[in-house]
């Protein structure tokens, strides 16, 4: 199976403390808690993690068998006392996610290998979220959603976020939007668990201290029937960040709040990683308070854990960067691209369509004195909740205006229905698709 041969490393992100001592001090654990407060100039500070018995660090591992977070999570899921990078182990899956692009193929493989009348291993652990090709009249795209709907009815899948009225997404209370953001908002991302999904950006969920990675349709079809998968334990790269956060650094440049952590883990796959993981802390627990009632057990890397390599960054010296065509690693400092003409702007997707992202864009317009946009600017909220936030939350410093009001004032396009939009292309009637013989010279995406 494809996933068993992946040798890409895991990435562990550790923001160091700026003030005081945390519950996980260097004497007992190498972590502290990142927290952003505008009133203290965006300093990274440490806070006390809640002392709750069901959420204390897992006992898996010891000084004699020190492990990283990823190794501990996979050890728990494989019922092993210790794991080392390179080992292949059968891992019990806590959540399997699929969507309208890969779901039909995964379902087909499940039925072929397990039988036409086979039942999934656990109807409450499979999450199906249509999000890619939704607001289109393309018959094949619509058929994909029909296949998901039929399968969920047949299997009595508990978590199917369906959409039937594509003309008005708000008429579909079950519909959420982009799977990676919806998974978090609906409480499916929990510390210490294993989440697999048929999408490369499934690693987004690592922001919650869980092992999350993308798999193919064949693997997903197997998980549907067996509830487990053969995985290779990856080596871990450790990233330590400290210093004061400059005002001009945004979510894609570093991790602070929960949504920004999701952005960082989301982009691990672009760096060649198998998964990214951030230690769960009070910020994580607070986010999950009203989203899940299921118990979970966070784990933390042992102080003696071995890492393939470690990188340290002084965030006070970081600058905004731009990924240029045609590869994510073709990067440059934003100031080096100041003379590049931009043809279109697209704010959206799983990495840039969260509430924090639209807030950041709106604040820039406020700071500019509400200057009009000079190029077409498309807006695609990731989920229904984000769409509502865009229309309801006041933007600081705007006198009470919402993001939508500010975007309208400066000439942006009306926020579209929540989905993956143009990120993956799609049928000809996909929102923001050019449908022209020549591609745009330079499109700026947030």
Predicted regions and their residues:
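Fe-S-dependent hydro-lyases/dehydratases of central metabolism
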Residues: 2-446
